[in-house]
Each structure stands twice: as structure tokens, then as C-alpha cells.
A protein has these predicted regions:
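Canonical BTB/POZ domain core
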Residues: 10-19, 23-128
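Cytosolic, low-complexity regulatory segments enriched in Ser/Pro/Gly with interspersed Lys/Arg
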Residues: 1-6
Length: 128
């Protein structure tokens, strides 16, 4: 007899621990430099949520061997929110950040956030 089980709490616990490690800058293997901001992360985590980072880290490009990656022409606060999303699956979309968050989520190919931004903008439309 065999049984496959899924314990969601374990997955949540694991990501909470990884996020805590990230916040303490422990066991991180990449630093994303966006403007004046340095965002510490784990390549495996950000590659798992972004096809952009997946391609960057799994192909034979210069960035795949670097520990520091400069992201140009991206809003630093949006990148920070998206990295937080990679670890928590939560993101706060506001009238103030949606105009910056949407283009960065498109560049990084983060479809759930892109859709959430579009839904947010659509909900803000006034038919009059």
C-alpha cells in the first residue's frame, strides 16, 4: 500500500524560513542591484517564479556565474516587492505603485502579478 500526502504547512514553513534567511542576508547566492538598492536573494527561489531569472541563471550567460546582477531601467521598489512575492506569494498593489509594478512584472515575466495589476487597473476604471 502506498499513499502520497501533501502537507501545505511544510511548504509554507520552508518558504518562511527561506524568506527569513533572505532578510538576514544568509545563504543568499545573488544580490540584485537596482539603482541604489541591493536586494539579496536565492537564485533557486527567484528562478522558480520568474522565467526571466530562470533563463538568466540556467543558460550559459555571464550573469549565471555572477553573484551580483545589475538590473537597469527597472523601478527598485517594484523589484523589491516582486522578490518578496517570490518568497511569500503576497503582494500589495496600490494606486501609487501599479504604474511601476506592471512594467517590471512584464519584464520579469511574472504572469500572476501582471494579471493582478491589470485586474486592479480595470477595477479602477470609471464608466462615466
Amino acid at each position: 500500500m502506498e499513499e502520497n500526502i501533501f502537507i501545505e504547512e511544510q511548504m509554507n514553513l520552508s518558504f518562511n524560513i527561506m524568506n527569513d534567511l533572505r532578510k538576514r542576508k544568509e545563504l543568499c547566492d545573488v544580490v540584485l542591484c537596482v539603482g541604489d538598492l541591493e536586494i539579496y536573494a536565492h537564485k533557486v527561489v527567484i528562478a522558480s517564479f520568474s522565467p526571466y531569472f530562470y533563463a538568466m541563471f540556467t543558460n550559459d550567460v555571464v550573469e549565471s556565474r555572477q553573484n551580483s546582477i545589475t538590473l537597469k531601467s527597472m523601478d527598485s521598489k517594484s523589484v523589491e516587492l516582486l522578490i518578496e512575492f517570490a518568497y511569500t506569494a503576497r503582494i500589495r498593489i496600490t494606486e501609487e505603485n501599479v504604474q511601476y509594478l506592471l512594467p517590471v512584472s512584464c519584464i520579469l515575466q511574472i504572469s500572476p502579478v501582471k494579471k493582478a495589476c491589470c485586474d486592479f487597473l480595470q477595477s479602477q476604471l470609471d464608466p462615466s
